[in-house]
């Protein structure tokens, strides 16, 4: 949001899929009938499925990720005339969604700060967080692939200033190359 350009937020899209997509529900219910009981899909049911068997995260991902990917393609198509779009996708690299000309920005945050934010969530579950972390690439790999790094350990105002500077840098580099 701070970039003030169209933003595709994968986490928000996943939530929308759970809330709106009956086909996703039917597939999950068929594959995980012991856990998925009602539509819209409840996060508590997903958490229970992953808690009981770590392999269930792969089943869930195999159903949800293609739907989110289609939504991302639609978003990119709708915003193709925009100077810039922001893809806020935590598993961008893991799902091989980055393209050659993309400019990757690694957002670094202190572990304690991340944990503090996660604990504020309604369905906070440390076991699930550990399972999700195992599905992610190592932070060092992500940092190496990124052209820029921003520290997210500051106030919103400081972040706005940092993002403004980063935007200017990106536009300058794009216009001079």
What are these regions (language model features)?
Residues 5-7, 104, 149:
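Conserved beta-strand scaffold positions in the cores of enzyme catalytic domains, especially
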Residues 71-79, 84-121:
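ATP-dependent NMP and nucleoside kinases share a basic, alpha-helical "lid"
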Residues 12-15, 109-112, 134, 156:
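Short, acidic/turn-prone active-site loops that include or flank metal/cofactor-
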Residues 71-72, 80, 99-100, 120-171, ...:
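Small-molecule kinase domains that catalyze NTP-dependent phosphoryl transfer to phosphate-bearing small molecules
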Residues 60, 86, 150:
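Residue-level signature of catalytic and energy-coupling elements of molecular machines
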Residues 12-81:
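ATP-dependent small-molecule kinase phosphotransfer cores
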Residues 2-3, 25-29, 111-119, 126, ...:
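An amphipathic alpha-helix signature
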Residues 1-12:
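A conserved segment at the C-terminal end of the G1
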């Amino acid at each position: 949001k701070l970039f003030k350009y169209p933003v595709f937020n994968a986490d928000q899209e996943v939530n929308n899929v759970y809330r709106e997509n009956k086909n996703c529900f039917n597939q999950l219910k068929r594959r995980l009938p012991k856990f998925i009981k009602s539509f819209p899909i409840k996060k508590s049911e997903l958490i229970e499925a992953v808690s009981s068997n770590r392999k269930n995260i792969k089943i869930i991902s195999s159903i949800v990720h293609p739907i989110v990917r289609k939504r991302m393609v639609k978003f990119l198509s709708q915003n193709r005339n925009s100077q810039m779009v922001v893809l806020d996708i935590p598993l961008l690299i893991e799902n091989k969604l980055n393209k050659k000309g993309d400019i990757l920005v690694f957002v670094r945050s202190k572990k304690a700060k991340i944990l503090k934010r996660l604990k504020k969530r309604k369905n906070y579950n440390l076991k699930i967080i550990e399972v999700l972390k195992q599905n992610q690439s190592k932070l060092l790999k992500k940092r190496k692939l990124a052209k820029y790094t921003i520290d997210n350990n500051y106030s919103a105002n400081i972040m706005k200033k940092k993002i403004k500077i980063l935007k200017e840098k990106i536009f300058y580099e794009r216009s001079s190359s």
